[in-house]
Design a protein with these regions (language model features):
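Extracytoplasmic "Venus flytrap"
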Residues: 18-21, 25-43, 65-75, 98-99, ...
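Beta-alpha junction/loop-to-helix N-cap segments that form part of ligand/metal-binding clefts
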Residues: 10-19, 34-40, 52-140, 156, ...
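Sec-exported extracytoplasmic/periplasmic mature domains
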Residues: 43-54, 83-91, 107-115, 122, ...
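Solvent-exposed loop/turn segments at secondary-structure junctions
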Residues: 29-33, 67-71, 99-104, 122-127, ...
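Extracellular/periplasmic periplasmic-binding protein-like sensory domains
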Residues: 158, 251-327, 337-342, 409-418
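Extracytoplasmic ligand/sensor domains, especially the bilobed periplasmic-binding protein
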Residues: 91-212, 262-287
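Short, low-complexity disordered leader/linker segments with a strong preference
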Residues: 1-23, 51, 411-420
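Segments of small-molecule ligand-sensing domains
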Residues: 307-321, 332-399
Length: 420
């Protein structure tokens, strides 16, 4: 049975709604540091909303579901969590999931029920659209996931067809790397983002000396793969995958081989757990995140400071904490409009879905944005980070290690594909 944690929706300094309770949930891998820090953002948003009186007189009850099994995300666990929410009529929507492979499994069961899903972190483009050439075509299709039902899925982050190319451009042009070895973890996310990286890197004139893949269940030693990259002349390594698939352990093993070249990846490695996995070889790790860094967004300073006061733990703030905060607020705003549609009563899931689809000009901490008909955000920003030593982790713009607490992902740059 998947773990569920219920939060009694109060926050100091105000009175919650008195008309009753509306539930929202989340489906995240809270067994991981990244998953828990994302859940923190949702709880913070709900606490703030209830402290201000709730949503049109209703208290919002937030329940966090864990989709981990054996220390990693599980699509099967995610499906069970969504089924639990669907079975309780008080749930009107959810934040999540965290991983694209989980979304692929959840959309087909949530869509017929008009159940709103808003992901703070899914980046595989095929969840919402077809990928144009020269990138590899989708192996599954957004329309098939919805099976003729109205769209019920949105995300506040941009997609890997931007994220992969962003790191390819940064490695080629800024780090002056012209040959790389590419490794992916065989997941929906890992295969997709590494393929997008490949295409862009080659288009710039770079060489992918080898592209290898592995599966977590059967792999604990990457040295043979890494030696293949090294001997083929790779000047850097790009990895497509996530920390819970052990994608950052190869970085540690590079040190064992005496091979010191930059190690880049997507948002799946911009995590505390990745820094821990690199274990003594943290410097030289680069990562992208599929959105603006909230600490760099004008007007977000007060919200970030308030969050850190409420959640003061060293690893409570993560790469997608503020995206989750935005997603929760977008959902609660749609619920509020749906309450109006229901003449002040509890709305149906379809009323909430219809209002979510009308979201325009949403003002969040990561920017002001719309959603298109597919559920994608109008923001097309990719942030780039590097692991560096910092004097005060609390002032870091990224996430930090646990054991190596002063080694953090530090914001370096961003690419805005909406304006380029």
């Amino acid at each position: 049975m998947a773990l569920m944690v219920a939060f009694a929706c109060g926050g100091g300094g105000g009175t919650s709604g008195s008309k009753g309770t509306i539930k929202i949930g989340s489906d995240l891998p809270v067994c991981t540091t990244g998953g828990q820090s994302t859940a923190n953002g949702i709880k913070f948003a709900v606490d703030q909303k209830n402290a201000a009186g709730g949503v049109n007189g209703y208290t919002i009850s937030y329940q966090s579901f864990d989709d981990c099994r054996q220390g990693a995300y599980s699509a099967d666990a995610g499906v069970e969590n969504v089924q639990t929410m669907l079975g309780d009529a008080k749930f009107l929507g959810m934040i999540g999931p965290y991983n694209s492979a989980v979304a692929k499994a959840e959309i087909p069961i949530s869509s017929p029920q008009h159940f709103v899903m808003i992901s703070p972190s899914n980046t595989n483009p095929c969840l919402t659209k077809e990928v144009p050439p020269p990138q590899a075509p989708c192996t599954y299709h957004a329309a098939d996931l919805r099976n003729g039902n109205a769209n019920n899925y949105w995300r506040v982050v941009t997609t890997d067809d931007y994220q992969g190319p962003a790191m390819a451009t940064y490695m080629y042009k800024t780090l002056n790397i012209h040959s790389v070895g590419v490794l992916d973890d065989s997941t929906v996310f890992g295969v997709g983002i590494s393929g997008a990286f490949d295409t862009q890197f080659k288009s710039l004139g770079g060489t992918v000396v080898k592209h290898s893949e592995y599966q977590k269940a059967t792999t604990s030693d990457w040295k043979t793969i890494l030696l293949g990259f090294k001997n083929a002349g790779a000047q850097g390594v790009y990895v497509g995958g996530t920390d819970d698939q052990n994608i950052c352990i190869p970085r540690k093993q590079m040190k064992d081989l005496g091979w010191d070249v930059p190690f880049g990846g997507g948002d799946g490695i911009e995590t505390t757990d990745c820094i821990n996995q690199t274990s003594g070889n943290e410097a030289g790790v680069y990562a992208t995140s599929a959105g603006a860094d909230a600490t760099k967004v004008q007007g977000a300073t007060a919200t970030v400071a308030a969050f850190r006061k409420a959640f003061p733990g060293a690893n409570d703030f993560g790469g997608y904490t503020m995206q989750a905060y935005d997603a929760a607020n977008a959902l609660m705003a749609a619920i509020g409009r749906a309450v109006n549609d229901a003449n002040g009563g509890v709305p149906t899931r379809e009323q909430v879905r219809a209002q979510m689809a009308k979201t325009r000009g949403f003002v969040g901490v990561i920017g002001t944005y719309d959603f298109d008909a597919n559920g994608d955000t109008s923001l097309k920003i990719v942030s780039i980070y590097e692991v560096q030593q910092v004097a005060d982790p609390a002032q870091s713009t990224g996430v930090c290690g646990k054991t190596a607490a002063n080694l953090c992902f530090i914001w370096k740059d961003q690419i805005n594909y909406a304006t380029t």
